[in-house]
Design a protein with these regions (language model features):
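Tryptophan-rich substrate-binding surfaces of secreted polymer-degrading and adhesive proteins
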Residues: 497-564, 570
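ATP-dependent phospho-/nucleotidyl transfer catalytic cores
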Residues: 165, 180, 243-381, 454
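Active-site acidic catalytic loop and adjacent metal/ATP-binding pocket
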Residues: 151, 365-416
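Residue-level detector of functionally pivotal "anchor" positions at catalytic/ligand-binding pockets or at interdomain
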Residues: 577-604
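C-terminal catalytic region of ATP-dependent kinase domains
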Residues: 396-505, 554, 558-580
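Regulatory N- and C-terminal appendages and interdomain linkers associated
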Residues: 27-137, 477-507, 553-582
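C-terminal tail/sorting-segment detector
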Residues: 11, 617-631
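Conserved ATP-binding subdomain of kinase catalytic cores across diverse folds
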Residues: 123-306
């Protein structure tokens, strides 16, 4: 049997080596835990009364929030209790710790909000306990046993009015957040890694809103961002989550009463919008706010429907208040902007008949080409197979020119909906929804140039992405990953595929696009191959009506993901005809731009007062930018 001293040293070494608890060897920090009556007990008193003592029976001390708090060696006066603060500003935690109480489980519905309490400790001396409303979050993922959830902090009456505002790191102020489970993803944060990489990709571009003619200083990202978080439910370990920014107007730098600031989310594609017919139930107008439906009722994004305009009964109602009248007029404007967007593809098809030059000129009046090219390159690099129909955001700042940005990146880096990875050599079909039809036809050169530019700058490189991957993995740490695996052993990324008798997995991905789908009425003979649920299956004997698999999954690892990046870039170098070492596409030199330097930025888009060692992005008054390497 191991000695108490050996076990203690082993535990501490594991914690330190994985950056699990950052401050154990520095000054002690305090927090708070609660008894069954939710009465605050100062953690310093609890720790003093029950000193940490690892034994064989309590080695899983981190399984409970109480054990976590006790383990962190808390002392009086070392923690800032922010529970009573209306506004909280804090650096982004490397790893946060959250305990939800007042509910028995994570909700299963996005429509029903539950009242709960949240305790948060940032691992660096800050703590709070606040009321919040919690509901399920996500689409397909809502059926997984480990679910995403959304929280909105509320006042003492459980209302969303006068709610506390949080400023975390460089994020915009928010009063609510998403907590992403990433159940099929072994990193429990692959999507967050993708967003961070995308921000590096577009760091040399002007902000989206300025490209749309709206000039208002903001820290908005126009895509989510997140940091790792350990979540407990009623004191018991629930899992590793990502604490993430919501799709909120502040993160889009939009005003809720400005009709031209339109943000669409959902099934925005040829089937429901771009081909001239609008299915209003398939997507949500997230901004502006205070909209009204064609029936004169307040617009509800959970149940989207057609917006009101002058042709609708009830648009003119003498009993409407000034606020309602304003909302209806705003709705009519937004509706016209969306209808106009719906007709763009037909208009552009007509211009296409007049020639490429005319088509490009008209396309660039209607869409931000930079965002389309960046999205296309990003789509191909990360193999974002779920980002061509609904998991993207479409938005405009003037009601005329639209742009696109990614959202929901859980199926990237080869990871599929079912959790098994696809090889980096696997190809994706071309995006054809909306304006991408014309991007694929007429902007192949510009797309290849953008890819080459990003490769030359080092943004699309192993050196740029691997530190982001390793940073996330290190912030969570191997011990928490082991706990996650014990808590959710059926997670697809932890399990090998299980085939029914007569079938086996086929790994020849080169034939995927030419292989027919599984047909339950067909008789398959040994060697016959079919596609089902994103994977190839090969019959090992004569079978009819036998489903190929019991469990469609595969074990995934950090090593697989790291190797995938290198191989994927090699594949795309060949696809785009890029040769490492070729000259990058040049931005205008300082003497060819008009105006003074607008600002200096880091590679991930943060403004800095002066150039730093390494890569700097210098922007000029006319919108041009240069990448400068400072020795």
């Amino acid at each position: 049997m191991k000695s108490h001293k050996d076990m203690t040293m082993k535990r501490h070494f594991c914690i330190w080596s994985t950056a699990l608890l950052l401050s154990l060897t520095a000054t002690a920090q305090t927090g708070a835990v609660y008894d069954s009556d939710t009465t605050a007990i100062a953690a310093r008193r609890y720790a003093a009364a029950t000193p940490w003592d690892i034994t064989d029976t309590d080695k899983d001390v981190f399984d409970t929030f109480e054990g976590l708090v006790r383990t962190m060696g808390l002392e009086e006066g070392k923690t800032a209790d922010l529970s009573d603060e209306a506004e909280i500003a804090m650096p982004e935690p490397r790893l946060a710790y959250v305990n939800l109480t007042g509910i028995t489980d994570i909700p299963t519905s996005k429509q029903r909000q539950l009242q709960a309490w949240m305790e948060m400790y940032d691992g660096e001396g800050r703590y709070f306990r606040k009321r919040l409303l919690v509901k399920a979050q996500g689409g397909y993922s809502i059926r997984f046993p480990k679910r995403n959830f959304s929280v909105i902090f509320c006042n003492e009456n459980w209302e969303e009015e006068d709610t506390p505002d949080f400023s975390i790191g460089d994020w915009v102020r928010q009063d609510g957040f998403h907590f992403k489970a990433f159940y099929t993803d072994f990193m429990r944060g692959t999507g967050e890694i993708g967003y961070k990489w995308y921000r590096q990709m577009v760091a040399d571009r002007l902000p989206f809103w300025e490209r749309g003619g709206y000039y208002n200083e903001s820290r908005a990202l126009c895509v989510p961002d997140g940091f790792p978080c350990i979540v407990y439910l009623n004191g018991k370990f629930l899992g590793v989550y990502a604490w993430q920014l919501k799709k909120h107007r502040r993160n889009m730098n939009m005003k809720k009463a400005t009709a031209e600031h339109v943000h669409l989310d959902g099934n925005v594609n040829d089937l429901y919008l771009f081909n001239g017919k609008v299915n209003w139930k398939q997507f949500e107008a997230r901004n502006p706010k205070q909209l009204y439906t064609s029936k004169g009722e307040p617009y509800d994004g959970n149940y989207p429907s057609e917006l009101i305009d002058e042709k609708c009964k009830g648009f003119y109602n003498a009993e409407d208040s000034a606020e309602v009248r304003e909302g209806k007029e705003r709705s009519a404007k937004v509706k016209q902007y969306i209808l106009r967007l719906s007709g763009y593809k037909k208009e552009l098809a007509a211009f296409e008949r007049e020639g490429e030059e005319t088509l490009k000129r008209e396309l660039e009046k209607r869409f931000d080409i930079q965002s389309l090219l960046d999205y296309q390159v990003f789509f191909r690099v990360l193999m974002n197979g779920d980002g061509t129909l609904k998991n993207w955001q479409w938005f405009t700042y003037d009601g005329v020119k639209w742009m696109v940005a990614p959202y929901d990146l859980d199926q990237t880096f080869g990871i599929t909906l079912y959790g098994f990875p696809r090889p980096a050599t696997h190809t994706l079909s071309t995006i054809t929804s909306g304006p991408f039809t014309f991007i694929s036809r007429y902007y192949a050169r510009e797309e290849a140039e953008r890819y080459a530019e990003l490769r030359q700058k080092g943004v699309l490189s192993e050196e740029a992405i691997l530190p982001v991957i390793h940073d996330w993995y290190g912030r969570v740490g191997t011990e928490w990953y082991e706990m996650e695996k014990r808590r959710w052993p059926e997670s697809p990324c932890y399990c090998e595929a299980v085939c029914n008798d007569g079938w086996k997995v086929c790994d020849d991905w080169s034939i995927y696009n030419s292989t027919p789908n599984y047909d339950e009425y067909r008789t398959y003979r040994a060697g016959d191959i079919c596609v089902l649920d994103g994977r190839l299956w090969e019959a090992t004997k004569r079978v009819t009506g036998v489903f190929p698999y019991v469990r469609n999954s595969d074990i995934d690892t950090l090593e697989r993901m790291v190797a995938w990046i290198s191989e994927r870039l090699n594949v795309l170098d060949e696809y785009y005809g890029y040769e490492p070492g070729q000259m990058a596409v040049q931005r205008p030199a300082p003497d060819t731009v008009s105006g003074k330097e607008e600002g200096i930025y880091t590679i991930d888009g943060k403004r800095i007062p002066q150039r730093r060692k390494g890569i700097n992005i210098v922007r000029y008054g006319n919108g041009a930018s240069r990448v400068i390497y400072q020795k």
